Swiss-Prot record:
Superkingdom of the source species: Bacteria
Cofactor dependency: Mg(2+)
Protein species of origin: Corynebacterium glutamicum (strain ATCC 13032 / DSM 20300 / JCM 1318 / BCRC 11384 / CCUG 27702 / LMG 3730 / NBRC 12168 / NCIMB 10025 / NRRL B-2784 / 534)
The encoding gene: acpS
Listed name of the protein: Holo-[acyl-carrier-protein] synthase
Biological role: Transfers the 4'-phosphopantetheine moiety from coenzyme A to a Ser of acyl-carrier-protein.
Length: 135
């Protein structure tokens, strides 16, 4: 079985959210994701993180689709977003890496799975698609 999730993020609105005084939104990103974003030019910082946010959302949507007709395994407000980490290899190809606890919960709900991820940016938008292949 294959399950697909896609998310679209408006980069300008996302940047405003990041810049709000007292915002804790950066906490949704892992230390590694924040470090990689800080390596970008200031003008591309929000763009980079918007793509990562879209990727995290696309994973949740793909997982949710995989359990269609069943109640959610984790309430939306209980998701620990930094447990869904977007990593890139030396050539910039991205992948989802789940914290061990979350990976166990996902496996318990859908069985063994693998994921594929794509992130793209165009103008003021970032989009990500996650495909879960369930064995």
């Amino acid at each position: 079985m294959i399950s697909i999730g896609t998310d679209l993020v408006h980069i300008s609105a996302f940047a405003e959210q990041l810049a709000q005084p007292g915002s804790s939104f950066m906490e949704v990103f892992s230390a590694g994701e924040r470090r990689k974003a800080n390596e970008r030019q200031a003008s591309r910082y929000a763009e980079h993180l918007a793509g990562r946010w879209a990727a995290k959302e696309s994973f949740i949507k793909a997982w949710s689709q995989a359990i269609y007709g069943q109640p959610p395994v984790i309430a939306e407000e209980a998701v620990v977003w930094r447990d869904i980490e977007v990593r890139a290899d030396a050539w910039g190809r991205v992948a989802i890496e789940l914290a061990p606890e979350l990976a166990a919960v996902v496996r318990e709900s859908i069985g063994e799975f693998s994921s594929s991820l794509s992130i793209s940016h165009d103008g003021d938008y970032a989009v990500a698609t996650c495909v879960l292949t369930i064995q």
